[in-house]
Amino acid sequence: MSRSNRQKEYKCGDLVFAKMKGYPHWPARIDEMPEAAVKSTANKYQVFFFGTHETAFLGPKDLFPYEESKEKFGKPNKRKGFSEGLWEIENNPTVKASGYQSSQKKSCAEEPEVEPEAHEGDGDKKGNAEGSSDEEGKLVIDEPAKEKNEKGMLKRRAGDMLEDSPKRPKESGDHEEEEKEIAALEGERPLPVEMEKNSTPSEPDSGQGPPPEEEEGEEEAAKEEAEAQGVRDHESL
């Protein structure tokens, strides 16, 4: 009876073999439960399983002292994590893996809930730091890109200026040629008028004077009229 009473009295840190349905007797450690869990899990202990780093609430009937049951339940087993659990309970009984953080909320530590929050805060800080470093990296990457783009734009502008500069003399030369052609056309336009002026005396209908044959006929007619007038004057006498 005294032994059975002892089995029911476990304290935080005791090493045991814990039996769960569907699993062999597993190397485990008793963890102290918080006050909130004591009422809901009366007469039960929070157990941390070595190897798997999982936790469960078990009664005294499913717990067996490790040292007394080591020969009986400590035989090798093919279940995943069992061999690791046997090694941890012997060599590192106070192990606290990453998966054990959830059980730390119900462990012997008086500030279990603060630690995960601190870790989360650290994670956020790390995330922010990483984010800021990423942003800085982006800024650093963007600055050379901007410089390259600006240099590329300057090169393009310089190329455009070089391409435009030979075009401008061509355009000015084209304007000069066009002006010469216009001047030549303007110089050629008065020529037909001058030709017309020069050609008018040669035309028979210009009115400058009759041809020589007509002049001779007129002189003969004038002589005949003068002779006829003389005859008339003579007859009148």
From Swiss-Prot:
Keyword Chloroplast set for record: no
Annotated region (Disordered), positions in chain: 69-237
Keywords, sorted A to Z: Acetylation, Cytoplasm, Disulfide bond, DNA-binding, Growth factor, Heparin-binding, Isopeptide bond, Nucleotide-binding, Nucleus, Phosphoprotein, Repressor, Secreted, Transcription, Transcription regulation, Ubl conjugation
Protein name according to UniProt: Hepatoma-derived growth factor
Composition skew (Acidic residues), residue ranges: 212-222
Location within or outside the cell: Nucleus; Cytoplasm; Secreted, Extracellular exosome
Modified residues (Phosphoserine): S132, S133, S165, S199, S202, S206, S236
Glycyl lysine isopeptide (Lys-Gly) (interchain with G-Cter in SUMO2) crosslink site(s): K80
Modified residues (N6-acetyllysine): K44
Complex and partners: Monomer, and domain-swapped homodimer. Interacts with nuclear proteins NCL and YBX1/YB1.
Alphabetized GO MF terms: DNA-binding transcription repressor activity, RNA polymerase II-specific; growth factor activity; heparin binding; nucleotide binding; RNA polymerase II cis-regulatory region sequence-specific DNA binding; transcription corepressor activity; transcription corepressor binding; tubulin binding
Protein species of origin: Rattus norvegicus
PTM: Sumoylated with SUMO1. Sumoylation prevents binding to chromatin.
Compositional bias segments (type: Polar residues): 91-106
